[in-house]
């Protein structure tokens, strides 16, 4: 099965090019006119990782009412213009039938896009159909993806770009086991308003350090088996938080990816982070007592170990000092400050030569 991709299935007449109001056919070069801002918008959508597929009904194409040659001249000119400006359509799907033919490929039927659906090519959460007619929205519904109705005044191409490229980086994770019941909500583009309840006061304070210094909003509630000890609560919180952070980051396009910090307070806390998609932890800190507040010091390493597993990051973290409270706090603060650098959006590029993180 092919890797699922973000695909925009885009109508032609009335969406990419102006549809003639009288005969609804672009059958001469002088009738070819692009919709406003379509080229810069398609370029931005490509930069954001979308693949472009044209899907169009062309009534009676190849018949006497719409000769193939009449269609080809303006269509090929349109494609040449797009290509010359860097816009690449990965596929052009055309239904040539009349509605009365009752074919299987005319939108909103699925015949034209059948290969994409059956081949596992479509990322259903991120893909969309863009078109000016209700049939385009019906196609989207039949494909189980989002539909966006284009209109040059109310939902033009600049609006569509903004809509598709500025999605909130928010994720919610619910994790339930026999030992814990955890709900996590992270918003990477909001700060403040953190609400953290794990049943462990010192641990709550440490998690708040990550969110505050990481520059994101965290809402977290944990009901755990603290009547036994803090192990499951700390471990499962880390797993759920790491998963939520990873989901909120999405495809990681535009992020800094890397981060590092150095001294904090009287402790020498060092942190280097790579949101690489590969979990690895190098941890160096020692403690002189078994607990700080209600948190077992042995669980500090275990927290970051579990977090790196679900966040899928490479993390080098160390701290030295004389006070265990300050050592632990410096570790969480340093991680938060480093995470802030790594998740900050700096553009649209994917920070990887592999093309995936």
Swiss-Prot record:
Record InterPro entries: HAD-like_sf (IPR036412), HAD-SF_hydro_IIIA (IPR006549), HAD_sf (IPR023214), His_synth_bifunc_HisB (IPR020566), HisB_N (IPR005954), Histidinol-phos (IPR006543), IGPD_sf (IPR038494), ImidazoleglycerolP_deHydtase (IPR000807)
Gene Ontology cellular component annotations, sorted alphabetically: cytoplasm
Region of interest (Imidazoleglycerol-phosphate dehydratase), residue spans: 169-357
A single GO BP: L-histidine biosynthetic process
Cited Gene3D superfamilies: HAD superfamily/HAD-like, Imidazole glycerol phosphate dehydratase, domain 1
Binding of Zn(2+), residues: 95, 97, 103, 105
Location of the active site: 11 (nucleophile), 13 (proton donor)
Keyword set, alphabetical order: Amino-acid biosynthesis, Cytoplasm, Histidine biosynthesis, Hydrolase, Lyase, Magnesium, Metal-binding, Multifunctional enzyme, Zinc
CDD domains reported for this sequence: HAD_HisB-N, IGPD
The protein, known as: Histidine biosynthesis bifunctional protein HisB
Gene name for this UniProt entry: hisB
